[in-house]
A protein has these predicted regions:
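Helix-start/N-cap signature of alpha-helical segments
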Residues: 3-10, 78, 82, 164
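Charged, amphipathic alpha-helical oligomerization/scaffolding segments
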Residues: 9, 13-20, 84, 88, ...
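A mid-sequence, solvent-exposed acidic-amphipathic segment
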Residues: 122-161
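Leu/Val/Ala/Ile-rich N-terminal alpha-helices, chiefly Sec-type signal peptides and the beginnings
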Residues: 1-62, 66-70
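Short amphipathic alpha-helical segments and their helix-coil junctions
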Residues: 1, 62-75, 141-157
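Alpha-helical oligomerization segments
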Residues: 159-169
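Charged/polar positions within long, soluble alpha-helices
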Residues: 19, 23-26, 94, 98-101, ...
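Long amphipathic alpha-helical segments with strong coiled-coil/leucine-zipper propensity
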Residues: 42-123
């Protein structure tokens, strides 16, 4: 993939995470076939291409579709939160990238969590809980916060909160 294509896939990964955050916050459900590659991407430290981070382009398909719809302005009013999450995640990433100490802590903790995530299938909740703790201990301490909109019933569910924090990381 060209450099531009790599950037598109990376942005699609952000769009995919944002889309799943929106779905979990509003319905309490998620597409496992896209949640798994999104979460697994956190454990890919040394890959040759961005697509490999998602286990291939198929792992970022939902994000590619959402990114295409965003750019073509084919999304309705209900997708406004997804667009906001994308911009907020990118803004938070810039703040995170400026903090080398936090980067080191997050990487170290993700490397430790990846050992526990080797048998990811069937353990989504445990892995997301572990990653959620990393998010709470690091990025949630930054001044900028991402406000997630949705149903109180789904947002107050600790399992959903863990999935949302893991995706935001």
């Amino acid at each position: 993939l060209s450099n531009l294509e790599q950037q598109v896939v990376a942005l699609a990964g952000v769009a995919q995470a944002a889309r799943i955050v929106d779905q979990v916050s509003k319905t309490g459900t998620y597409p496992l076939e896209f949640l798994e590659p999104s979460i697994h991407s956190l454990f890919e430290f040394d890959t040759d291409s961005v697509a490999d981070v998602f286990g291939g382009l198929a792992g970022a398909k939902l994000g590619l579709q959402n990114l295409s719809a965003m750019l073509a302005n084919r999304q309705g009013e209900e997708s406004r939160d997804v667009v906001r999450y994308v911009f907020n995640i990118l803004y938070l990433e810039r703040k995170f990238a400026a903090d080398t100490e936090m980067i080191s802590v997050v990487r170290s903790r993700l490397e430790h969590a990846s050992f526990n995530a080797e048998h990811f299938a069937g353990h989504v909740d445990d892995v997301c809980h572990s990653i959620s703790g990393i998010y709470q201990d690091t990025l949630s301490g930054l001044k900028f916060r991402i406000k997630v909109n949705g149903s109180a019933q789904h947002l107050n569910d600790s399992r959903n909160a863990d999935i949302i924090r893991a995706l935001l990381l």
